[in-house]
């Protein structure tokens, strides 16, 4: 299997990441990747940048050092109803790729049925393309049901080695 893109990365505008956009693109190039999505946390996450970061993504070149740069975000799942970070439409228009993920700081782990319901609701969110790090053991859910529904709704499930 050849990996051609990394669709879940954070630059140093997210507190737990340490590389600049330029460094991330260079690393992607050095690894032979064709594309990289820059998906910093949403603005309501304590680890995320200000919303202006996402408004300014239109300034990021589409191609750097031969690597396609995908302008993205990692939305936080914030409610059992499938709520995610709220952003102004002017910021969302610069987003090409969006993940939705559970993070303990904004969604305390609950039970399997609550996690499943939240994920199912997000299947209908037109701004979300994929689910991030579903392998987090703190957020058990009905895998078979959600994965089959992702296929029906055209959503992607990330394989994240940090969760393995």
Which residues does each PLM region occupy?
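Catalytic phosphate/metal-binding cores of nucleic-acid and nucleotide-processing enzymes, i.e., regions
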Residues: 1
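Metal-associated gating/positioning segment near the N- to mid-region
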Residues: 13-49
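Extended substrate/RNA-proximal surfaces in nucleic-acid metabolism proteins
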Residues: 29, 42, 47-159
């Amino acid at each position: 299997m050849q990996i051609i893109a990394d669709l879940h990365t954070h630059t140093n505008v997210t507190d737990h990441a340490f590389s600049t956009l330029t460094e991330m693109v260079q690393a992607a190039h050095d690894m032979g990747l064709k594309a990289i999505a820059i998906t910093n946390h949403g603005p309501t996450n304590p680890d995320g940048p200000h919303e202006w970061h996402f408004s300014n993504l239109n300034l990021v070149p589409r191609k750097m050092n031969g690597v396609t740069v995908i302008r993205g975000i990692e939305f936080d799942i914030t409610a059992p109803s499938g709520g995610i970070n709220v952003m102004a439409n002017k910021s969302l228009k610069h987003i090409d790729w969006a993940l939705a993920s559970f993070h303990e700081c904004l969604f305390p782990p609950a039970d399997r049925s609550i996690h499943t319901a939240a994920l199912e609701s997000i299947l209908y969110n037109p701004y979300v393309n994929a689910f991030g790090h579903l392998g987090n053991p703190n957020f058990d859910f009905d895998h078979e049901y959600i994965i089959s529904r992702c296929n029906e709704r055209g959503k992607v499930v990330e394989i994240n080695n940090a969760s393995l």
